[in-house]
Amino acid sequence: MTAVTNLYKLDWNDDIDAELGEKVLYNENATLQDLLDSNLCKLTFVGQSKARSGVKKDKTKTLTDLASSATGRAIDKALAKLQVDHEAFRTIVPVSKCADGYVYARIGTKEGVTTGDEYEILEQQLNPKTKKIEYKKVGSAKVEDNEIWFNTSGADELIANAEEAEAAEMKKAQELGYTKFKSDKKDYSGYYLRLKKKKGKIED
């Protein structure tokens, strides 16, 4: 299966926000057609990515289910590639917990995480002037080897098709429920992570 993913940016500013609110959002009689006719929601093309994933064998599942899982994996890879190439599209994820110089987050192979990837640790702040949420870098973290959550779409099928030793490792990684990052010994509970530098390759 091959997934082609296009990334668009919504053109937006305070003037558009105010006009849309007046014409549509705060108008009780407004309809979806009014939103379309307002011509306020415009998109700018940012980039494109492609990724492939093979259909695995599994006698316990239908071909439709297997094809669906392969499609999901291809889409996940394509989205992960877009995040690497376009900083504004990078997901900000909450830190799940901190302990002994490590931070943990519920992201993994589905999001394209690989060993050695570098992440920023961010603090959420309210800008007193704009009243908008901003994120300030307060630290760094690096993905630990063999501590990456195996949450890939159709993970059970991949495990079923792997050799015994590899399948055992994949199963162990699947049961982690988190990815482990090396950081300093500060308490980053309530903070966030965002990809800074990609070290590993997202395989097709």
Ranges and model annotations:
Residues 1-204:
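Surface-exposed, polar/charged interaction patches used for macromolecular assembly or partner binding
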